[in-house]
Structures are given as C-alpha cells and as structure tokens.
C-alpha cells in the first residue's frame, strides 16, 4: 500500500497557480447533449480555443469522433483516444498534485456518476471510472489509487495552501461514501490532497444534480479570498442556501488562520430552464436521468475556469452577465476575463468548470 500523498509531501495547487495544461473531453453523449451536441460542440470549441492561447489542451475523443473534433479544432489540441461515458473532465479526470521538487502525482478517485445506485445520473459509468488512471498513464504520471473513496473533481476546491472547500450536501450524500463518517471523509481528503483543513459549506446551488458541487457555488480567487454565488431574492430557495454558506465563511478561517474576503457573485436574474424545444434533442439510454420542460437548471457564474491567460465565465444572455464579468475582472487583474455563451453546456447539466480539469505546472 502506497503512503498517502500527504505523507509523500504532495499537495493540490490552487487553480490560479500556473498550469502545464487542461484536460477536456469531446461531448458526444446523446442523453446529455441535445441535437447531436451541435451547439455544445461550438461552445466547447470556443472554450478550447481560449484556453489554448495560454496552455496545452488535451482532448479525449474516441476514434469514431476524431475527424469531427478535428474539423472543429484542427491542430489546436493534443488528441487522446481514451473512451468515456460523458464529457465531464472535472469529475472523471485525475486530481493532479505536486511536491516541492515539481514532481506530479495523479489521484484516481472512484466515480459512480454522481450517486451510483442511490441517485446516479446514468447506470453505465465504467469508462468514466477509468479516465483518471488512463489519462495519467498517457501523461506517464504516477497514480495514487484513492478507490473505493467516491469523489468528483467538482466537489473540491483548493487554495494551494492547505485549505480545501467542499459542500456537506455533496460529500455527505448517501450516494457517495455512506459507510464513512464526516470525520473519516475529512481525513481521507486531508491525506489524499496533502491539505491541513477542510471547510464544509452547508449547500451548493439549488437543484444541482451533482448533489450540489462546491464548484458551482464558491471558489477561491486568491489566498483567503473567495467568490460566493448570491441572490437578494428572499423567495428564491437559493437565498437561504447562499446565506447559510456566507454565515459559515464569515466565521471560518483558512488553514493559515486568515479570515476570508468574500465577493458575492449574483446568480442570473432570470431562471434558466429546459424548454419544450430542447426536449426532442435528447436521446436517453435505459436508467438515465431524463430532462423535463420547465426544469430549473443550476446556472451560476461561479462555474468559471481559471486558465493561464484567461478566466472563462459562463454567460446566459442575462442582465447579470456583465455584473459577473466586472466582479471577476477585479479579482483577476492579470488575466483576460472572457464571457462564453454557456446555455448549451448548462443543458448537459454543468458548465465551464465542469468540463475542464487543470494539470498543474
């Protein structure tokens, strides 16, 4: 049995630290990406091209879709023929740690499609569960096998200085690690991520089908500095959820004992929902979660991705689009803050952060 990454001197850097590259997966699942994913593929392409200006992009695409992906992207990416069940690189890719000598270690968590038999979103996730180890192998990186501990990359944020941010709603959900206590889960995170402290936010974003991943509700933008999804509408269920998170963050400190500067990032003013026009585009397999008209989607500007040269921020043709860009521009003065039309990614169930996974320098 290998020593824990913490004992070996590894830690998880912050996303805003320098990247070697970014991992993404070409979107092809008919039950996630309506109408053959045409609009999603355009959105993915814009994201990939923006990230590629400052770092390498590795794209997992199966042979059957290679020529299609190449028609969109040409030689802008490194193509890898690794099979997947869907395109959520954040959740299926490895969490890559570094040590002070610059060596890397890829953590391979168990993946069960956000809840397994309890409330998972699809039944066959065998390929997804292998993505982390296969990608690490392609990069010739050593792997720390954290299985059978179930975790998705979207469920954790790191400040690179010993603090991990999570939500109770996700990590304590019955579909993840029901046989472990909160204390055992926390200890596994600290040992596997080389961290000193876990901060447990109560909630994520209302109706987020990942059981409320942290990456949709809060994110580190610097040491002791976070953004938090917010609404002033007291009738929106999100209000009480964000308020509980804010109250916790206001009384917490990071691993170094510093209090947080908290920036409130509004959610879109208009609720994002699945429409009647969207529905015919989805083709589901047996046992797969199905969309319905009027279903509220978990839209949040917090689901941005910090690349080397840019911060990619979801846009929803909403009055708060520009507000979010302005707030994040102040948080990231040294990066270009780029708005990306993102409804077509949201229709798949996530957003820009969910389809990207950083590979630290």
From Swiss-Prot:
A single BP term in Gene Ontology:
putrescine biosynthetic process
Q: Which residues form a coiled coil?
A: none
Annotated active site residues, numbered on this chain, are 354 (amidino-cysteine intermediate)
For this UniProt record, give its keywords in alphabetical order, as a comma-separated list: Hydrolase
Which domain of life, per UniProt?
Answer: Bacteria
What are the annotated disulfide bridges? Answer: none
InterPro entries associated with the record: Agmatine_deiminase, Peptidyl-Arg-deiminase_porph
- The yes or no answer to whether the keyword Hydrolase is present is yes
MF terms per GO, please?
A: agmatine deiminase activity; protein-arginine deiminase activity
Q: Name one Pfam family in it.
A: PAD_porph
Matching entries from Gene3D superfamilies are given as: L-arginine/glycine Amidinotransferase, Chain A (3.75.10.10)
Q: Which reaction does it catalyse?
A: agmatine + H2O = N-carbamoylputrescine + NH4(+)
Matching NCBIfam families, A to Z? Answer: agmatine_aguA, PRK13551.1
Provide the family line.
Answer: Belongs to the agmatine deiminase family.
Protein's recorded name:
Putative agmatine deiminase
